[in-house]
Design a protein with these regions (language model features):
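Active-site helical microenvironments for divalent-metal-assisted chemistry
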Residues: 1-187
Length: 187
């Protein structure tokens, strides 16, 4: 890849470092989209032995690129995001991806299509981990930062996404226990 094109891509992706998510970190600072994506990819890295028949390199690639559309629209919490918001983000992302050099434009387009279809083991795993990471981060954030709706949401979020995997179902149960303990402690 031509160095200046790589720099252009990286300058766009850098926006995710400044794009803040709805959730706080354990120290009470807003989490960035880049931080979420990094830890999501780290989760996939450490779970490769649990999913030996899954192309974990592909899952990690999905994790790394999944929120790039938020470079253009910012982060909108899932419970506030409308179909119009999703369409706008998808359109801006598609426009950006189409301007990437080959073969990256085709690879990213194929990954996004696979992620949206949620038909492959890789796409389903990426989506489940994406949602689980969000709940883990909420469990790590001060409870004073939670919205009232998040008390129930954090107990059920991702349940349907993990159902395909006994391991993820067990992980979700452990995360739910952490949520219940956090609510019980009130911290």
């Amino acid at each position: 890849m031509e160095p200046n094109k790589l720099l252009d891509i990286l300058h766009t992706a850098e926006r995710l470092k400044d794009t803040l998510r709805h959730c706080d970190t354990s120290k009470g600072r807003r989490e960035s989209v880049a931080e979420h994506s990094w830890r999501l990819a780290l989760m996939a890295f450490f779970l490769r032995d649990e999913f030996p028949d899954t192309d974990m390199d592909r899952v990690i690639r999905m994790c790394l690129i999944h929120d790039l559309g938020e470079c253009f629209t910012g982060d909108i919490p899932s419970f506030l995001k409308t179909d119009a918001d999703t369409e706008k983000e998808d359109s801006l992302l598609e426009q950006w991806v189409s301007g990437l050099p080959a073969p990256y434009n085709a690879e990213m387009s194929a990954l996004y299509a696979e992620m949206n279809a949620l038909q492959t083991p890789e796409a389903r795993l990426y989506k489940a981990l994406d949602k689980l990471e969000a709940v883990i981060q909420h469990n790590e954030s001060p409870i004073a930062t939670w919205l009232p709706r998040e008390y129930d949401l954090n107990l059920t979020y991702a349940n349907e996404n993990v159902a395909f995997s006994p391991y993820l179902t067990e992980l979700r149960a452990a995360i739910r226990r952490d949520t219940e303990e956090k609510i019980q402690r009130g911290e």
